[in-house]
Amino acid sequence: EIFHSLNSQGKPLTQSDLLRSFVFMRAEKGSEDRDKLYERYWKYFEEDFWDRLVRRGNQWSSHLDVITRVFLSSKKGFPVDSKKVHLEYKNWIIQDKPYNNVNDELSAFNQYGRRYRYFQS
């Protein structure tokens, strides 16, 4: 339970932290190369841009938290509550099985993130 609430610095985990953990745990279970997936798709989201805070309504969120919510909302076809992104994403992946593997999932997320960043420039 603590693992799902605090990071290594003792700060609360964000929705994108929880999502990343969920994705890479599934990659390992599926015998996919986590390091290769990280280098190919997730390392891009470690750049400073993704940690910058942006205001959405009366709430401040990192670009990474925003894109995880927008990505999921676009895939599900309706807005997802910013506090429930991890749970909704997990349910979507388990129930709908929209991707054959984590590689395909991260590829789609990475492409979506690159388009988002392009339009933020």
Regions found by a protein language model. Name each.
Residues 1-121:
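Polyanionic (Asp/Glu-rich) segments that form extended negatively charged tracts
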